[in-house]
């Protein structure tokens, strides 16, 4: 039963990630994440893209690239929120 509770926790994490992407990210932002991971995005609806991103990010073999992507996105957000540096970062 220990394995079962671990599976439930992971399912909760996956659901939380899907909810976060759905509530807090635009389709354009999700397209950028998919591009970074080289996930094909042609003709995919937002929900389909979210599902693929979450599956990708929860695959242990993608741990390093996922952490790097999250760190770089955090840096972009920080730069974007800085009055001086935001002038040099152009995010459309």
Short names for language-model regions:
Residues 2-92:
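Basic helix-extension-helix modules of the SAP/HeH family
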């Amino acid at each position: 039963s220990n394995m079962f509770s671990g599976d439930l926790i992971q399912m909760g994490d996956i659901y939380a990630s899907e909810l976060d992407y759905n509530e807090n990210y635009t389709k354009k932002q999700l397209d950028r994440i998919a591009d970074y991971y080289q996930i094909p995005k042609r003709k995919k609806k937002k929900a389909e893209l979210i599902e693929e991103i979450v599956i990708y990010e929860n695959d242990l073999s993608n741990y390093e690239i996922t952490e790097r992507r999250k760190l770089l996105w955090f840096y972009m957000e920080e730069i974007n929120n800085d009055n001086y540096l935001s002038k040099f970062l152009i995010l459309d």
